């Protein structure tokens, strides 16, 4: 029986061609293959990967394999898979379980499958959003007697998650605890997943070390900002074909993702307003030239609304009922709870095309909802460009190597890769875009108290 689930294996050739192109735009990952391909530092690592199954992720997967790892993969979002990329990975012999538009039930079943290694346990997790980590740790707590944790689901997603946990416990008693105890570490890709890890550690519920990849400078200041700057408008255009020039757009949140999103919309000619709860970010937005407002003051006038906060209930049902006819509503934060999509269930929905729905309000006005409130840049388009994802994924590979080869040096907790590795990731990407670094002379290095080879900034420096 084939150890993969993809939409159409015949798409593998198309996927392979796109992988070949992506490799030329991902110098960091290709450099790691060259540096570590012979020594295979990930030999023996059995990595359960939960991250958007895109062309760029396929290059990451093949890099992990080239470095010796045994890998099983699922997407971390029901809409983000590129089916031809999944097919290419399946055809290469790597077990992958991902279909664009999969159901929530399938999503959690596929998450379960990434842990089904031949000997019964994985020993590493590569996560994006924290769902793979959540699945194992929540299941282990239920096995330990905390059955109330899955007694009352609060969403459709929790219904499917809790059912999958019960199913696995019935089929293989003690499975979650066995998996948890075998895991040596997790590397986490995104802001939301990192929040989960810090919360687990604070409560004493994180049993293994975790590396916070998101807060590597070469991830958060590049993927989150420059990636969103290109992919947000791409997703809106593919979904709606609307002209953004002259439109009023509201970006909720001005962290790194919000900064990139506001720049994306401004670059398309939109008149951008920003909402913020953090006074520092609000001041940044204002000094970047954006009007900082509260949502209630602009909800009737704006044409496009984008959430970027990582928080819940940012755009609520009362906001959507006040929006102008055919306002576009979308999210580029990791989860779908930034917009109160569940509150729209009893309204009239008209599906326009995949991941584009028109929803009629009681007043007769309509909104266009993108990707059901999930990541629109991946649901309605193909996500960030390969080059910026190379920086993020180079950090992921380095984090996996660090945890696998030096795991004994780490206690349970959340860690960040050292500055020297952050600078290495940046350095690996300079030649591709024609950057030439100025060399620091020894007397200059002495003057500012650094080594000639770096790192050039203190750990606390904010870029």
From Swiss-Prot:
Its EC number is 3.13.2.1. SMART domains: AdoHcyase, AdoHcyase_NAD. Substrate binds at residues 54, 128, 189, 219, 223. NAD(+) binds at residues 190-192, 224, 253-258, 276, 311, 332-334, 377. Binds 1 NAD(+) per subunit. Its cofactor is NAD(+). This is Adenosylhomocysteinase. The lineage of its organism: Bacteria, Pseudomonadati, Pseudomonadota, Alphaproteobacteria, Rhodobacterales. The gene is ahcY.
């Amino acid at each position: 029986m084939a150890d993969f689930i993809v939409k159409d294996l015949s798409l593998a050739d198309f996927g392979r061609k796109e992988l070949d192109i992506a490799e030329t735009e991902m110098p960091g990952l290709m450099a790691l293959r060259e540096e570590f391909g012979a020594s295979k530092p990930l030999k023996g690592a059995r990595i359960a990967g939960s991250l958007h199954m895109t062309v760029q992720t396929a290059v990451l997967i093949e890099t992990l394999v080239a470095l010796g790892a045994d890998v099983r993969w699922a997407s971390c979002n029901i809409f983000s898979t590129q089916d031809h990329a999944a097919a290419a990975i399946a055809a290469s012999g790597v077990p992958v379980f991902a279909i664009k538009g999969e159901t929530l039930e399938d999503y959690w079943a596929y998450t379960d499958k990434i842990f089904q290694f031949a000997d019964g346990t994985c020993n590493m997790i590569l996560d994006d959003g924290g769902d793979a980590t959540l699945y194992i740790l929540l299941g282990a707590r239920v096995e330990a007697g905390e059955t109330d944790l899955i007694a009352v689901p609060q969403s459709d997603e929790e219904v499917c998650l809790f059912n999958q946990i019960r199913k696995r416990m019935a089929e293989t008693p003690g499975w979650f605890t066995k998996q948890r105890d075998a895991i040596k570490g997790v590397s986490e890709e995104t802001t939301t997943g990192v929040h989960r890890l810090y919360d687990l550690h604070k409560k004493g519920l994180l049993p293994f070390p975790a590396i916070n990849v998101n807060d590597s400078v070469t991830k958060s200041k590049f993927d989150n900002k420059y990636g969103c700057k290109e992919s947000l408008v791409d997703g809106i255009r593919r979904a709606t074909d609307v002209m953004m020039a002259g439109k009023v757009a509201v970006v909720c949140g001005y962290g790194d993702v919000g900064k990139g999103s506001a720049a994306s919309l401004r670059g398309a000619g939109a008149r951008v307003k920003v909402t913020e709860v953090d006074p520092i970010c609000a001041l940044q937005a204002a000094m970047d030239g954006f009007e900082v407002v509260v949502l209630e003051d602009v909800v009737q006038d704006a044409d496009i609304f984008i959430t970027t906060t990582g928080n819940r209930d940012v755009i609520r049902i009362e906001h959507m009922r006040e929006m102008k006819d055919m306002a576009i509503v979308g999210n580029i934060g990791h989860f779908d709870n930034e917009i109160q999509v569940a509150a729209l269930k009893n309204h009239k929905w008209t599906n326009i095309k995949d991941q584009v729905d028109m929803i009629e309000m009681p007043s007769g006005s309509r909104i266009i909802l993108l990707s059901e409130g999930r990541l629109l840049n991946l649901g309605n388009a193909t996500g960030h460009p390969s080059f910026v994802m190379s920086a993020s994924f180079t950090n992921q590979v380095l984090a996996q190597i660090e945890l696998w080869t030096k795991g004994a040096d780490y206690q349970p907790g959340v860690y960040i890769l050292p500055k020297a590795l952050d600078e290495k990731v940046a350095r690996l990407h300079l030649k591709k875009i024609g950057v030439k670094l100025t060399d620091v002379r020894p007397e200059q290095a002495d003057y500012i108290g650094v080594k000639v080879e770096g790192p050039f900034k203190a750990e606390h420096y904010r870029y």
